[in-house]
A protein has these predicted regions:
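Sec-dependent signal peptide recognition
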Residues: 2-11
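Beta-sheet-dominated interaction scaffolds and their linkers
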Residues: 21-44, 148-165
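Asparagine-centered strand-capping/turn motif at beta-strand->loop junctions
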Residues: 41-47, 170-176
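Short, hydrophobic/aromatic beta-strand segments
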Residues: 49-57, 179-186, 238
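Short, basic/aromatic beta-hairpin or loop at an interaction surface
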Residues: 59-69, 182-187
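Intrinsically disordered, low-complexity Pro/Gly/Ser/Thr-rich segments with frequent PxxP/GP/PP motifs
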Residues: 64-98, 190-218
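Terminal connector regions
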Residues: 95-146, 216-256
Length: 256
């Protein structure tokens, strides 16, 4: 019994290195304009076996009960089967629940891929089956917001402060009605950098993020590099320099 359990644990540890989900979502985020009643989400089966899929939305609680989570969206179909090499469009329908009109709201789209039962194979207690879950953000954008977050990136206010333990924190103030997501960020001292443990910054908020300890960098921070993510999921590189007691956006001039 112990050897069998140990064997299964070993297999579970090795699985992430060679298994991946067959089902994919077209895009890494969903922009839902308030002017639309619904948007379509394309899902595709890139595997060689049929896939059973369940989809739902949530408000950010990763482990919340699917049946009790309340969001202003309806998904149809909520459960479906996709043959190998085929796709399925899912309708994301806004149910009319009142949402703020002066800022974006964020929710999550979830897709759970359930592996099919192999026909003709006897039940095997040692067989390990995995279900793959994918989550992407849904940004509900009021009609009054006519630009994208990327067009507002220069309005973010960055600063650096010291925590009580001596480590550095990067503060980001977002005075805009848009959510800002980041691929990466780092403080710089010349050519040397230290990563910032950055996360999404909601509208009209200020958040602080810790910097990876690196005294050669954090004792003299002269710049900040970051990659913001636009509406299409693409990352854009930005560069801030310390000038006149503030971090100023100094992106390179685009090449013609």
């Amino acid at each position: 019994m112990f050897i069998r359990a140990l064997y299964l644990m070993l297999i579970a540890l090795l699985i992430p290195f060679y298994l991946q989900a067959a089902m994919t979502i077209s895009g890494t985020r969903i922009i839902f304009p308030a002017s639309e009643k619904e948007v379509n989400i394309r899902t595709n089966n890139r595997g060689d076996k049929p896939a059973l899929v369940q989809v739902w939305t949530d408000d950010g609680k990763v482990n919340g009960d699917v049946n009790s989570v309340k969001t202003p969206f309806i998904l149809t179909p909520p459960v479906y089967r996709v043959e190998p090499g085929r796709g399925q469009s899912v309708r994301l329908i806004y149910n009319g629940t009142a949402l703020p009109k002066d800022r974006e709201s964020v929710f999550w789209f979830n897709m759970l891929e359930i592996p099919p039962k192999e026909q003709g194979v006897a039940n095997n207690k040692n067989k390990l089956e995995l279900a793959f879950r994918t989550r992407i953000k849904i940004f509900y954008r009021p009609s009054s917001l006519t630009e994208s977050s990327e067009e507002q990136v220069e309005k973010l206010k960055w600063s650096v402060k010291s925590a009580s333990n001596g480590s550095k924190l990067v503060s980001i103030e977002n005075p805009t009605p848009y959510f800002f997501s980041f691929d990466s960020a780092a403080v710089k001292n010349g050519s040397i950098g230290a990563d910032i443990n950055i996360d999404m910054v909601p509208p009209f908020t200020r958040l602080e993020f810790p910097v990876k300890n690196s005294p050669s960098v954090t004792n003299n921070i002269t710049a900040i590099d970051f990659r913001s993510i636009n509406d299409y999921g693409a990352a854009h590189q930005h560069h801030l320099i310390w000038q006149n007691q503030a971090f100023i956006l100094k992106d390179p001039t685009p090449q013609s």
